[in-house]
């Protein structure tokens, strides 16, 4: 029987001191060697498994990594300081491992705005060129591949347009052209396991669903033991040498919260589907991958754990940015949600993507990819009564959109 992400997380078990049911937090920045020669061998890469310095490795961060690895079906995982650190370090490490002399990346035109800015404005200064293509068009992806291409980067569900990546097909392309497939699974933890579908590396912004409380900035990278080990190599590891490490206190808190991540994701999904179905009945311009009317609903259905559902993100297109602002203000006043970026919080968060998390993408390109100025992205929470929240939503919507 295949082990679900929920069961895999459940089976990670660490005891605290004196048999405590909660593991201790190890906040030491440096560790003692009983034999000076062991320190020397560690620095030379001859001795593995020793704690040296917390920029290299930390026991509490490591046990959090074990839970992320269990969730993703990975050999190993590493917690880092943020989701952007996870993306940057994972991609740069691949190029370092492949020779480190520059190269080329193919990615989606509809990625998160911060990712777009990193790829467009920072990576080229480091010798990495990037082609942005339509991620749902496999022919366009293959046409963009060059001899120097090393990475295909995509999101399980694109942010904010909710296009679904065909990870199996992408993996086949990567195998054919000897590329590494990196998938940002931030929108779909517990729902989708990209590594099982053929991806090589998975990254997360743990700030979102894994935290669930909008109180930490954190990220994670999952993959093979060899790849995760390369990230913290004392001589060539991008995480080790650039330093975006996870605080052990954050790692401990996230380790504990992952036990109920599955319960939370189910609740996000259930409420989102309820609201999306009601919006669809009212013929509102809603996009949610759990609706059968979504262009790639069938594809996503072949990838998800249906016990978890289709996630907690939906979008609604308003006439323009001003109408979106007015609607969001009314919704906040009526306590439907909070006008704030990010996602994965227990309460609903709303933002106008073109004016916030996708503002890094030039307006001309936003028009080309269909990201309307009035698009409202909702990260649906699970607190309160669904029917009451729906009634509040429609009261506000009808007062704005007549």
Language-model segments: residues:
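Short loop segments at secondary-structure junctions
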Residues: 30, 223-227, 318-322
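Conserved small-domain helix->loop->beta segment predominantly found in fold-type I
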Residues: 273-347, 361-367
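Conserved PLP-enzyme active-site core in the AAT-like
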Residues: 5-16, 76-287, 293, 301
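Short, well-ordered beta-strand elements within core beta-sheets of diverse protein domains
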Residues: 254-263, 311-319, 377-381
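A common structural junction motif
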Residues: 239-242, 331-344, 395-402
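Conserved N-terminal alpha-helix of the aminotransferase class I/II PLP-enzyme fold
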Residues: 33-85, 93, 114-121
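PLP-dependent enzyme catalytic core of the Aspartate aminotransferase-like
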Residues: 75, 120, 129-131, 322, ...
């Amino acid at each position: 029987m295949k082990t679900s992400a929920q069961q895999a997380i459940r089976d990670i078990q660490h005891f605290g001191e004196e048999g405590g049911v909660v593991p201790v937090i190890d906040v030491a920045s440096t560790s003692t060697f009983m034999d000076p020669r062991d320190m020397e061998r560690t620095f030379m890469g001859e001795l593995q498994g020793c704690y040296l310095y917390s920029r290299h490795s930390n026991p509490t961060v490591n046990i959090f990594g074990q839970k992320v690895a269990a969730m993703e079906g990975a050999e190993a995982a590493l917690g880092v300081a943020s989701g952007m650190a996870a993306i940057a370090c994972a991609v740069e490490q691949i190029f370092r491992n492949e020779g480190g002399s520059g190269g080329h990346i193919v990615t989606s035109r509809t990625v998160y705005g911060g990712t777009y800015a990193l790829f467009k404005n920072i990576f080229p200064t480091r010798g990495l060129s990037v082609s942005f293509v339509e991620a749902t068009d496999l022919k366009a992806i293959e046409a963009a591949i060059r001899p120097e291409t090393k990475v295909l980067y995509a999101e399980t569900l694109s942010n904010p347009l909710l296009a679904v990546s065909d990870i199996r097909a992408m993996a086949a392309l990567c195998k054919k052209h000897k590329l590494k497939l990196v998938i940002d699974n931030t929108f779909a933890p517990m729902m989708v396991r990209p590594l099982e579908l053929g991806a090589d590396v998975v990254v997360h912004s743990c700030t979102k669903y894994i935290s669930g409380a909008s109180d930490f900035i954190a990220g994670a990278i999952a993959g093979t033991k060899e790849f995760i080990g390369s990230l913290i190599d004392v001589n060539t590891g991008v995480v080790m040498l650039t330093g975006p490490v996870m605080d052990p206190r954050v790692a401990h808190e996230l380790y504990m919260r992952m036990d109920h991540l599955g319960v939370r994701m189910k609740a996000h999904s259930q409420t989102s589907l309820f609201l999306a179905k009601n919006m669809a009945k009212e013929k509102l311009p809603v996009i949610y991958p759990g609706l059968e009317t979504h262009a790639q609903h069938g594809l996503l259905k072949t990838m998800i754990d249906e016990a978890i559902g289709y996630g907690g993100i939906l979008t609604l297109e308003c006439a323009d940015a001003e109408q979106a602002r007015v609607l969001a203000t009314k919704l906040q006043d009526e306590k439907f949600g909070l006008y704030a970026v990010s996602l994965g919080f227990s309460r609903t968060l709303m933002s106008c993507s073109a004016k916030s998390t996708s503002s890094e993408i030039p307006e001309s390109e936003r028009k080309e990819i269909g990201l309307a100025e009035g698009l409202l992205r909702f990260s649906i929470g699970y607190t309160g009564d669904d029917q009451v929240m729906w009634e509040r939503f429609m009261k506000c919507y009808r007062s704005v959109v007549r």
